[in-house]
Amino acid sequence: MTRKSSNRSRGRKARSGKSASSSKLQIWLGRIWSIGWKLALTLAAVLVFIGIYLDSMIKQRFEGQLFDLPTVVYARILTLEPGNGLSLQELRNELDVLNYRKVAQPRFPGEYASSSSRIELIRRPFEFADGPEPDRRVMLTFDGSGLNKIESLEQKRELGYLRLEPKLMGMLEKDSPEQRLFLRRDQFPEVLVDALLVTEDRDFYQHDGVSPLAIGRAMVVNLKAGRTVQGGSTLTQQLAKNIFLSSDRTLWRKLREAYMALIIDYRYSKDRILEAYLNEVYLGQSGADAIHGFGLASRLYFGQPLQELRIDQLALLVGMVKGPSYYNPMRYAERARERRDLVLKLMMEHDILTAPEYQQAVTRPLDVQKTAQIASRQPAYFQQVSIELKEKLGDKFKADSGLRVFTSLDPVSQSKLEQAIHDQIPQLAKTAGKDLEAAAIAVDRHSGEIRAMVGGKRTGYDGFNRVLNASRQIGSLVKPAVYLTALAHPDQYNLATTLEDKPLTLKGSEGSAWTPRNYDRQYRGEVPLYLALAQSLNVPTVALGMKLGIDQVSATLGKLGVNRDEIRPVPSMLLGSFSLTPYQVAQMYQTLTNSGKKAPLSALRSVLDLEGNVLYESLPRVSQAVDQQAAWLTTYAMKQGVQEGTGRYLNAQFSSAALAGKTGTTNDNRDSWFVGVDGREVTTIWLGRDDNQPTKLTGASGALRVYAQYLKYRIPEKLQLPWPEGITTFGFAKQTQGGLKLDCDNAFKLPIWDNQQQLKQQCENRPTEWIKKLFEW
């Protein structure tokens, strides 16, 4: 073969090899392309599927209830009206409880100025049950009788009334540990939003949920630092993570976070996203509760509504977003201050603050509360609220559905009652022993609304509530029911009726004998009915009760609100040998001292759902349970008990208040009771031991002392009892045997229900003085 033909042969082989290689490459590329586009299509389908799933999940949360919202509980709404007797000092106390700030000249909501006869204040805006009310600048003028004028300084006119916003009591316990106070977007101060964006997400209004610029900026900072010191997540990404994802540092979580942020940004407005973030962000702990949202964090750290915080305080909260535990101002004050000042500096650099404003803000102290708490704890009262919510709402009650509950709690009464127990129990325990316990409840005398409740000497302890659950013998607290039963028969009994105080022995059906004795072991021979009750004498009470009949007294107790199944019909029940809770005693005495009108005890006033719909509203349910005149006369005798009977310790300190009261002591001094009544409240106090051992305390030496301490803090309102129809005063002369005799002209007077006008006729038919002298001559 020639060289030329050989070369041609090699050329053909080379071309053939190249052609084969090219063909293989094309086949390989074709396969890659085929696999690639299939994979891409599959990936796209997966992404679409994931997107649809994530979109559905986001829509379900955002267009339903985005958060678990706690049931928010408020104290009573105080309505100020000229002529209602409210003193200037009492209003100051109310404003202090509501954390109003005393200043020289009010400029902002939540501030007031005070003089000797005036208070100028700017009432905070609040969304009441019947609608929202804006902030309002008013001048309140007082005279010797109390509040006499309310003037709107903006409208230059007098107002008939003014409502103060209620105190936030706290949130009811729920399954989730998250707690938040939801605010609408327009309720957040704009300077807070500006500070947050300049610190956490400067491109918020420009990006679509994910910010490549922020990611790049974070990468540069982290590379320079040699470690992760700055994240590139937008607020939208943080929101997606907080609501839907865990905090795991994985690529898969970051990808889902970014994808969800894009969907959220596409579906919802920037303001809607901001509202969600501002209410969702975690900002610390209060015990076991996780505090979410700026609204509740403001209450936790500063004890003030968010709208009233200074710029430096808002900056502190914004600074804590990066690490609430690390920058906790209550534990790491200097670290928190540095972070706050950094936020303030960023605000100045971005023209949110001027240089002078910045300088003023960085020089301010942190001004956080001494202890991190949302509100004062009233666990006993909260238990009552929970019970009533379940009773009134049934299946509608869900603790995480954002209900707003308005109660009748009086924050001044509550705090002063707690303070009285804190002060007195250590002193009384020196006599009774360290295991001495307490329970107390104060109710409105007319409406039956529960104004305060303390379940034990550890007032903030959420445990056994003795007001509701400690059923103890009531001792002499039963006696007014015995005398009420008698006074309901005015043709047979009145306050001047003579009762025998002589040795008495009662025989039982099985031959047993019971001999009641007075506490002092003395017998007085004869005693007027009113004094037997005032001095809480046992023997006359038992004698009277047996004459009336045990069933009759038991029926009276039933009318006053006592479950008759609790009462064993034996003679000793006339001295309180049966057991009631302080709650049941409070109901009994509310009815008695309200001229026989029973108003069921209640803590709820109204309940609103998240949209503001009224789910429950309390309506007056007062009924005449016992004769008005008989109840009034019994209460009068209880007033005498404070003046000259077992409650006279009170009269020495509060004589001008004309108080009524009743002591109660059980066998071996196991229980010490006192029920005190002023013009405002019926307050029931019990002292004893959970193991039912003796305390060495009587009602007068124990529970009454707690009540007296309470009145030192909570100035009593004078008890005025409007005279019912048919009650007339008559003169009586004291007899040597101890009883009373009608003496129409005598200076010593007693009110009498003279329904058949027997005493009136006796006085009208008596001989005149000159005729008597004539016969004497």
Swiss-Prot record:
Residues 53-777 are periplasmic. GO terms for molecular function: penicillin binding; peptidoglycan glycosyltransferase activity; serine-type D-Ala-D-Ala carboxypeptidase activity. Gene3D superfamilies: Biosynthetic peptidoglycan transglycosylase-like, DD-peptidase/beta-lactamase superfamily, Penicillin-binding protein 1b domain. Residues 415-709 are annotated as: Transpeptidase. Residues 1-30 are cytoplasmic. The chain crosses the membrane at residues 31-52. GO terms for cellular component: outer membrane-bounded periplasmic space; peptidoglycan-based cell wall; plasma membrane. Pathway: Cell wall biogenesis; peptidoglycan biosynthesis. Keywords: Antibiotic resistance, Carboxypeptidase, Cell inner membrane, Cell membrane, Cell shape, Cell wall biogenesis/degradation, Glycosyltransferase, Hydrolase, Membrane, Multifunctional enzyme, Peptidoglycan synthesis, Protease, Signal-anchor, Transferase, Transmembrane, Transmembrane helix. Coiled coil: none annotated. The active site is at E200 (proton donor), S476 (acyl-ester intermediate). This is Penicillin-binding protein 1B. It comes from Vibrio cholerae serotype O1 (strain ATCC 39315 / El Tor Inaba N16961).
